[in-house]
From Swiss-Prot:
<feature type="compositionally biased region" description="Basic and acidic residues">
    <location>
        <begin position="282"/>
        <end position="298"/>
    </location>
</feature>
<comment type="similarity">
    <text>Belongs to the UPF0761 family.</text>
</comment>
<dbReference type="Pfam" id="PF03631">
    <property type="entry name" value="Virul_fac_BrkB"/>
</dbReference>
<feature type="region of interest" description="Disordered">
    <location>
        <begin position="282"/>
        <end position="318"/>
    </location>
</feature>
<feature type="compositionally biased region" description="Polar residues">
    <location>
        <begin position="301"/>
        <end position="310"/>
    </location>
</feature>
<feature type="transmembrane region" description="Helical">
    <location>
        <begin position="102"/>
        <end position="122"/>
    </location>
</feature>
<keyword id="KW-0472">Membrane</keyword>
<keyword id="KW-0812">Transmembrane</keyword>
<keyword id="KW-1133">Transmembrane helix</keyword>
<keyword id="KW-1003">Cell membrane</keyword>
<dbReference type="InterPro" id="IPR023679">
    <property type="entry name" value="UPF0761_bac"/>
</dbReference>
<feature type="transmembrane region" description="Helical">
    <location>
        <begin position="45"/>
        <end position="65"/>
    </location>
</feature>
<keyword id="KW-0997">Cell inner membrane</keyword>
<protein>
    <recommendedName>
        <fullName>UPF0761 membrane protein Ssed_0302</fullName>
    </recommendedName>
</protein>
<feature type="transmembrane region" description="Helical">
    <location>
        <begin position="179"/>
        <end position="199"/>
    </location>
</feature>
<feature type="transmembrane region" description="Helical">
    <location>
        <begin position="247"/>
        <end position="267"/>
    </location>
</feature>
<feature type="transmembrane region" description="Helical">
    <location>
        <begin position="137"/>
        <end position="157"/>
    </location>
</feature>
Length: 318
């Protein structure tokens, strides 16, 4: 039997959600994520070609990925650059091809620019978490290098595994044959959740609870998927940029999408960082309310509760 929804619990949930939204709104106003997103969008466009060049270089170093480079490129451009993906892919591949012909000094410069992007992301997210302790140069460089090297490899490995599973004969003609296309269709969503979850768990120089990071990752992934579809519809139905800029329309379109993407990433980070703050604030309010009720009945009990709460806060700080 389906249990009836308790009106008190529903009221408490709605009220808590509303209070959390108020807290989140205050946080967004303080952090000015629109300005930070603009900065990250600028750095991303500056680092886009170096990042793609480094990614493709890493994939070419592993023979197992040689046959799926086109798949990986198509997956990235189709799922992360709506509507203008084909045009952007042509230009970026041409730029990457030119960059790969450069000298060792030029390639090293590309690596530095790519690391600049990761460093900017690191600083932006740690500012959201209000972290004051900075990582050492060795730890930071190791983390950035791991992202540059392992990121493309993990992406390629996931696509290889997916292609292998789909091609298995056990799925052909079985009851699961209809499930596989659905799973493949949902792959971008799963990939988005996993990517955001990894960012929110690893990048902040502070311990982040898995549930909080998962909540922020799911919200960000949903907004990202809806944003892709909405942005593609807007470009198709209202081709304003193409009418104004003509052949150069790809540039403002790409910048707008990158900016919107960073807004979504930072919003998910704000949700993740705001969760423990709100829960601590609510718990503190409950403790104060309990103390006031106890004081009304017995001052001695009030003193005991106050002492216990203060000791608990000191232990948490330590």
């Amino acid at each position: 039997m389906i249990k009836k929804i308790d009106g008190t619990q529903l009221h408490t949930f709605v009220l808590s959600t509303w209070h959390f939204m108020i807290h989140l709104k205050q946080r967004l106003a303080e952090d000015q994520i629109n300005i930070r997103a603009g900065h990250l969008a600028y750095v991303t466009l500056l680092s886009l070609v170096p990042m793609v060049a480094v990614t493709m270089s890493m994939l070419s170093a592993f023979p197992v990925f040689s046959g799926i480079r086109g798949q990986i490129e198509g997956f990235i451009y189709n799922n992360f650059l709506p509507a203008a993906g084909d045009t952007v892919q042509v230009y970026i591949n041409e730029f990457v091809s030119n960059a790969s012909k450069g000298t060792a000094v030029g390639i090293a410069a590309l690596m530095v620019v790519a690391i600049m992007l990761i460093s900017a992301i690191d600083k932006a997210l740690n500012n959201i978490w209000r972290t004051t302790e900075k990582r050492s140069m060795v730890v930071s460089f190791s983390m950035y290098w791991m992202v540059l090297t392992l990121g493309p490899v993990l992406m390629g490995a996931s696509l290889v595994a997916t292609s292998y599973v789909v091609s298995l004969k056990v799925f052909n003609g079985s009851d699961l044959s209809g499930v596989v296309p659905v799973l493949v269709e949902r792959l971008p969503m799963f990939f988005s959740v996993a990517t955001f979850l990894l960012i929110y768990m690893v990048v902040p120089n502070i311990k982040v609870k898995f549930f909080h990071a998962l909540l922020g990752a799911i919200v960000a992934a949903l907004l990202f998927e809806f944003g892709k579809k909405g942005f593609a519809i807007y470009l198709t139905k209202f081709p304003t940029y193409e009418a104004i800029y003509g052949a150069l329309a790809t540039i403002p379109i790409l910048f707008m999408w990158v900016y919107l993407s960073w807004i979504i990433v930072l919003l998910g980070a704000e949700i993740t960082a705001a969760m423990p703050e709100y829960l601590d604030k609510r718990q503190s309010g409950k403790d104060e309310e309990s103390e006031k009720k106890a004081e009304a009945h017995d001052p001695q009990i009030s003193f005991s509760i106050s002492t216990a709460v203060n000791e608990s806060k000191k232990e948490n700080r330590q």
